[in-house]
């Protein structure tokens, strides 16, 4: 065997060694993840229904964290929040909300539904055909009607659930709706 053939053979063996070593390291890194069983879902305090408005996603999370609910709630997001869960204009949204609530009760034993609508909601304008943000009192009344209607429907289907109704301003301030 010539010098050239010896070098080729060493290179081939070195590459084979590296390939096996890399595969072994990869397998050893994956093994714990594959052998570990997934964490069981724990009970959470509530299911939050809120609007999809990008302007308030961070404010909503901040609000929930400020209440001590970080990682303690399930979150359903529908355009219009309460209105999205009730509107006949988009019936699939109704179904989505109720199915998510059913699953949250089964998996996480939620005992409370928090419904968080917000001011200057574009979905209210699209679905109801009017810009309520121009008249704060009317906007409050319309949101309160939708929120209260959803609470009645939730309590009719799940009498043991507590339902909390909230309305958030664009600055993140939250007011309770009774």
Predicted regions, residues:
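N-terminal secretory signal peptides
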Residues: 1-12
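MPN/JAMM (Mov34/JAB) isopeptidase/deubiquitinase module and associated MPN-bearing subunits/adaptors
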Residues: 2, 163-178
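N-terminal twin-arginine translocation
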Residues: 10-16, 27-42
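Short, conserved "active-site rim" segments that organize catalytic pockets and cofactor/ligand binding
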Residues: 20-21, 25, 40-94, 168-174
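Short HxH-centered metal-ligating active-site micro-motif
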Residues: 71-136
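A structural motif corresponding to the C-terminal end of an alpha-helix
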Residues: 107-110, 150-163
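A short acidic, glycine-rich active-site loop
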Residues: 136-145
